[in-house]
């Protein structure tokens, strides 16, 4: 009787472990389909005042390993004042999304932003794509309306992407 229970218990544990590996593998395939285990650092400049805002790309760097999320890549758990969205080049499928809030957007709420123009550096980390992607950066107002956005293409083979680390 004890031996039968022990076998049942071992079978249950083995099945559970196998299911966990299968589920992990399914999520890993989504990451591995579009990305490699490297980080792409994109430096942006946000500039402007309360009347107009601008986003420009400053530089791109890549470093070893990706330490961010590998599952639910297009889900955003918490909404911020902006989002970075990654799609395969010329396609509509979102393969990575993350939200953020910036000091620039906070500064826009101060009186100084009514009569002065400033610029702020911002850095975003995304997994390194295998192929060319379109990266969209959107900034929202307090009503969740897009006030400024920038879409640019990143080719992972671009010689201007600096390798660091």
Which role fits each region the language model picked out?
Residues 114-165:
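Non-catalytic propeptide/linker segments at domain boundaries
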Residues 28-122:
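N-terminal prosegments of processed precursors
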Residues 1-32:
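Bacterial Sec-dependent N-terminal signal peptides
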Residues 5, 9, 48, 68, ...:
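Residue-identity detector for glycine
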